[in-house]
């Protein structure tokens, strides 16, 4: 770091993203991207005519996308705010609803950016341990007196709470915002969007990166009552008014409209997840009951970090977290059937099955 860095940032530990190799030699099962390309409707929407309009700023109100999203989710446009990836939605929410005297509560094993953002913005953390089996006890979050963020389904475990459990947390914290990060909800979770009109303290965040094949476009949505969304827009228009580029606005709108492609690709991933889990368990792995587009697995036959390295040597990238309680586990993105068969073949060679 330079001698000019603010003292407030010197102890911040940045987030470590998954590896993004710039060549094609790896089977990439490490960052929970979709193995399928964007919808053909997206390719049509991002036309030459739209590219030529890149000389112009994008619509800061994101009106066309909001109208499409409102119709899709059964909400009003004023109940939705697009973000430059759901990370921006989440960051804006923490900026709006937390500060040095208003902490953020989250699980000890969950999406790593929550803790990073707390460090960046000097927000106190209330870290709530998951149970020994990595499940979350909703009653641990009752009456906390803090803003709460829940990844549901959780990452990296893939486990999910039913909507009724989230509703219990909402009822037990009427004076605090409860943020539900639904990045993986389309693969088997139960969305809390239907609860938005019932709970003024509920903010739901979703992404286009997983089930809608737009990780590289960076688009997310925050959804809640109109006053919460107005709070987020206060942050947005104080920081980054043109936060969604023109091509992403068009791509996101087209992705929402092509429900048939969404259903087909989602079903394919869920089916592949099912038989991959069975194959891993047949090889002696412990595999959690994922409701996401990845599996969280471990084996007593080899340390998680060592297995990650051996797989990488064989051209297969998975995610290993060198962290308490989960160091022996791997997070494995669900790819195409051929990619998962290649993973299993590599594991057989490493473990000498």
List where the protein language model places each region.
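PLP-dependent aminotransferase class I/II
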Residues: 201-281, 285-288
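Phosphate-binding glycine-rich loop
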Residues: 63-103, 121, 301
């Amino acid at each position: 770091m330079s001698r000019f860095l603010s003292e407030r940032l010197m102890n911040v530990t940045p987030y470590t993203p998954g590896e993004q190799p710039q060549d094609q030699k790896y089977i990439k099962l490490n960052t929970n991207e979709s193995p399928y390309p964007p919808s053909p409707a997206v390719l049509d929407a991002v036309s030459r005519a739209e590219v030529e309009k890149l000389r112009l700023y994008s619509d800061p109100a994101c009106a066309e996308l909001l109208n499409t999203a409102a119709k899709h989710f059964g909400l009003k446009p004023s109940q939705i705010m697009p973000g430059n990836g759901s990370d921006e939605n989440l960051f804006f929410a923490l900026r709006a609803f937390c500060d040095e005297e208003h902490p953020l509560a989250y699980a000890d094993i969950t999406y790593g950016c929550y803790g990073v953002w707390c460090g960046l913005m000097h927000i106190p953390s209330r870290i709530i341990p998951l149970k020994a089996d990595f499940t979350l006890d909703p009653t641990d979050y009752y009456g906390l007196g803090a803003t709460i963020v829940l990844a549901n389904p959780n990452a990296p475990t893939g486990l999910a709470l039913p909507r009724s459990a989230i509703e219990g947390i909402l009822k037990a914290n009427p004076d605090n915002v409860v943020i539900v990060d639904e990045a993986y909800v389309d693969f088997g979770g139960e969305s809390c969007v239907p609860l938005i009109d019932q709970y003024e303290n509920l903010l739901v965040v979703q992404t286009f990166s997983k089930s809608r094949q737009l990780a590289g476009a960076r688009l997310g949505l925050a959804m809640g009552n109109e006053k919460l969304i107005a709070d987020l827009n206060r942050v947005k228009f104080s920081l980054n008014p043109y936060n969604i580029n023109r091509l992403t606005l068009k791509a996101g709108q087209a992705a929402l409209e092509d429900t048939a492609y969404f259903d087909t690709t989602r079903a394919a991933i869920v089916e592949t997840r099912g038989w991959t889990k069975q194959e891993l368990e047949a090889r002696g792995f412990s595999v959690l009951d994922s409701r996401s587009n990845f599996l969280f697995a471990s084996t007593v036959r080899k340390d998680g970090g060592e297995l990650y390295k051996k797989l990488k040597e064989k051209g297969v990238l998975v995610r290993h977290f060198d962290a308490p309680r989960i160091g022996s586990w791997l997070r494995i993105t669900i790819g195409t059937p051929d990619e998962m068969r290649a993973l299993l073949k590599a594991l057989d060679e490493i473990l000498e099955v």
